[in-house]
Amino acid sequence: MSQLTPREIVHELDKHIIGQDAAKRSVAIALRNRWRRQQVQDPLRQEITPKNILMIGPTGVGKTEIARRLAKLADAPFIKVEATKFTEVGYVGRDVDSIIRDLVEAAVKQSRERETQKMRARAEDHAEERILDVLLPVARETGLQMDSIEAESATRQKFRKKLREGELNDKEIEIELATPHTHMEIFAPPGMEELTTQIQGMFQNLGAERKRMRKLKIREAMKLLIDEEASKLVNDEELKLRAVQNVEQNGIVFLDEIDKITSRSETSGADVSRQGVQRDLLPLVEGTTISTKYGMIKTDHILFIASGAFHLAKPSDLIPELQGRFPIRVELTSLSAGDFVQILTNTDACLKRQYEALLETEGVRLEFTPDAVKRLAEIAFAVNEKTENIGARRLYTAMEKLLEDVSFDAEKHHGDAVVIDAAYVDKRLGDLAQSEDLARYVL
């Protein structure tokens, strides 16, 4: 993260998301500010809190994609949650504190994967030795003389060479492997998650690690042994400690569909999943301490990014206290036909390239002409205007319908080039786009 300036972060996001420059700039600055804060000396560092972001824009314009790509760039603990999944404390459903518990779980998993990767080379060596021990029992254990030991060592090196070159991959061996711990899930009422985690930990620690003999091919045994050896080399306590610290200093929470928990003035009735959830979110966003099975987590420096379409509600419908917790507001614009053309062709994993790669696996060479791409974008845009505007997601539907015949009869086109031009697009989608009723149900 320290290597990326805001301009470089925006450049990376441009590879995957078309337009929405204001939103990209805001998240880039917020991400860079995490690193800047780390360079400030205490006690001032503790006073610098992240400025949370509220992204406002219609569906399918890139709100979720911006958050998803940002998480990959940050390489920080990240979780995306739907605000509608939570209920006020005391009601049936998940309470908002579980957001932080899930974030810590994600951080522990991320730290474990990182540490395991560091230890992989050593784990591979240990796994290799264990397989060689099965193939060639150690000479000293069998009571052989020194010259026999030297001969055994030479044989071991020959087998090691064969093992590394993959010549023994399909050979079956019987090897002792640790049996994985069975995770027992205990469901508890809201507010008793701490007790639940303690009970789970107690049951997991009851049985010692058991081992059993398994008959496997060397290829499969090697994978399992590498994982087992790597887990032995990782210090679990240090790992959890670093994960907790990482969450507190670099954690990012993306709250999607926050507009769905607004309480509109014209509606009446229970607001279990609306104002109650907003009130519960307040301390979380402001800064509080949450109890998890890995210890107490302070949320003061966790960055919250909220997003919503706000079709039926306005940001001002959020309770005033929560509005104040999201000082940076960014409005995302609807996508034009020109944006659709760029989405189809200019991003790193554009739709056109994805379908070309998929059909290439069956020997079909798909070729899109520029006028076909333009016509497809125009049709998708027109359908969005006539019916519900679902943004770039309309392109997925249109592309599936366009290539339905080619995908179904791919074997007939094996070794051929299938050219998609404007006439082909009109033939497949023209009538559907012109009929509003058909477009509503098919596109």
Swiss-Prot record:
One of its GO terms (molecular function) is peptidase activity. SMART domains: AAA, ClpB_D2-small. It holds the Pfam family AAA_2. GO terms for cellular component: HslUV protease complex. It is found in: Cytoplasm. InterPro entries: AAA+_ATPase (IPR003593), ATP-dep_Clp_protease_ClpX (IPR050052), ATPase_AAA_core (IPR003959), Clp_ATPase_C (IPR019489), HslU (IPR004491), P-loop_NTPase (IPR027417). The keyword Nucleotide-binding applies. The keyword Hydrolase does not apply. Keywords: ATP-binding, Chaperone, Cytoplasm, Nucleotide-binding, Stress response. GO terms for biological process: protein unfolding; proteolysis involved in protein catabolic process. ATP binds at I18, G60, V61, G62, K63, T64, E65, D256, E321, R393. ATPase subunit of a proteasome-like degradation complex; this subunit has chaperone activity. The binding of ATP and its subsequent hydrolysis by HslU are essential for unfolding of protein substrates subsequently hydrolyzed by HslV. HslU recognizes the N-terminal part of its protein substrates and unfolds these before they are guided to HslV for hydrolysis. Belongs to the ClpX chaperone family. HslU subfamily. A double ring-shaped homohexamer of HslV is capped on each side by a ring-shaped HslU homohexamer. The assembly of the HslU/HslV complex is dependent on binding of ATP. PANTHER family: ATP-DEPENDENT CLP PROTEASE ATP-BINDING SUBUNIT CLPX-LIKE, MITOCHONDRIAL-RELATED, ATP-DEPENDENT PROTEASE ATPASE SUBUNIT HSLU. This is ATP-dependent protease ATPase subunit HslU. It comes from Nitrosospira multiformis (strain ATCC 25196 / NCIMB 11849 / C 71). The lineage of its organism: Bacteria, Pseudomonadati, Pseudomonadota, Betaproteobacteria, Nitrosomonadales. The gene is hslU.
